[in-house]
């Protein structure tokens, strides 16, 4: 029997606490019934609803037991198309905070930090004599 394929459009529809799909390594999982049992709390999973959770899943370093448990919720393989919608992975569009840790710190931020450090030491040297 051929494995079921699930489109990106379908995954995007399942993004609520009661109806929650995630994708890990192009496999789709319906984890709606696992929320209460998740050791990291349900909010972690709700934040990943309807999106590609491969990065966060790998970053946590789940045990083999956790990986085996995930397979119990497997419902099919993700069908990606070039011209179709893409699954969000990070940022506000995906329901996250909007912070993307993969982006480098901008030079202006480094300049700000440098100015603050210099100001701190100047204050200590000249004001707090």
From Swiss-Prot:
<dbReference type="GO" id="GO:0005739">
    <property type="term" value="C:mitochondrion"/>
</dbReference>
<dbReference type="InterPro" id="IPR018506">
    <property type="entry name" value="Cyt_B5_heme-BS"/>
</dbReference>
<keyword id="KW-0349">Heme</keyword>
<dbReference type="GO" id="GO:0020037">
    <property type="term" value="F:heme binding"/>
</dbReference>
<keyword id="KW-0472">Membrane</keyword>
<feature type="binding site" description="axial binding residue">
    <location>
        <position position="62"/>
    </location>
    <ligand>
        <name>heme</name>
    </ligand>
</feature>
<comment type="function">
    <text>Membrane bound hemoprotein which function as an electron carrier for several membrane bound oxygenases.</text>
</comment>
<dbReference type="GO" id="GO:0006696">
    <property type="term" value="P:ergosterol biosynthetic process"/>
</dbReference>
<dbReference type="InterPro" id="IPR036400">
    <property type="entry name" value="Cyt_B5-like_heme/steroid_sf"/>
</dbReference>
<dbReference type="GO" id="GO:0046872">
    <property type="term" value="F:metal ion binding"/>
</dbReference>
<dbReference type="InterPro" id="IPR050668">
    <property type="entry name" value="Cytochrome_b5"/>
</dbReference>
<dbReference type="InterPro" id="IPR001199">
    <property type="entry name" value="Cyt_B5-like_heme/steroid-bd"/>
</dbReference>
<dbReference type="GO" id="GO:0043231">
    <property type="term" value="C:intracellular membrane-bounded organelle"/>
</dbReference>
<dbReference type="GO" id="GO:0009055">
    <property type="term" value="F:electron transfer activity"/>
</dbReference>
<keyword id="KW-0249">Electron transport</keyword>
<protein>
    <recommendedName>
        <fullName>Probable cytochrome b5 2</fullName>
    </recommendedName>
</protein>
<feature type="binding site" description="axial binding residue">
    <location>
        <position position="38"/>
    </location>
    <ligand>
        <name>heme</name>
    </ligand>
</feature>
<keyword id="KW-0408">Iron</keyword>
<keyword id="KW-1133">Transmembrane helix</keyword>
<keyword id="KW-0496">Mitochondrion</keyword>
<feature type="domain" description="Cytochrome b5 heme-binding">
    <location>
        <begin position="3"/>
        <end position="79"/>
    </location>
</feature>
<dbReference type="GO" id="GO:0005789">
    <property type="term" value="C:endoplasmic reticulum membrane"/>
</dbReference>
<comment type="similarity">
    <text>Belongs to the cytochrome b5 family.</text>
</comment>
<keyword id="KW-0812">Transmembrane</keyword>
<dbReference type="Pfam" id="PF00173">
    <property type="entry name" value="Cyt-b5"/>
</dbReference>
<feature type="transmembrane region" description="Helical">
    <location>
        <begin position="105"/>
        <end position="125"/>
    </location>
</feature>
<keyword id="KW-0479">Metal-binding</keyword>
<keyword id="KW-0256">Endoplasmic reticulum</keyword>
<keyword id="KW-0813">Transport</keyword>
<keyword id="KW-0492">Microsome</keyword>
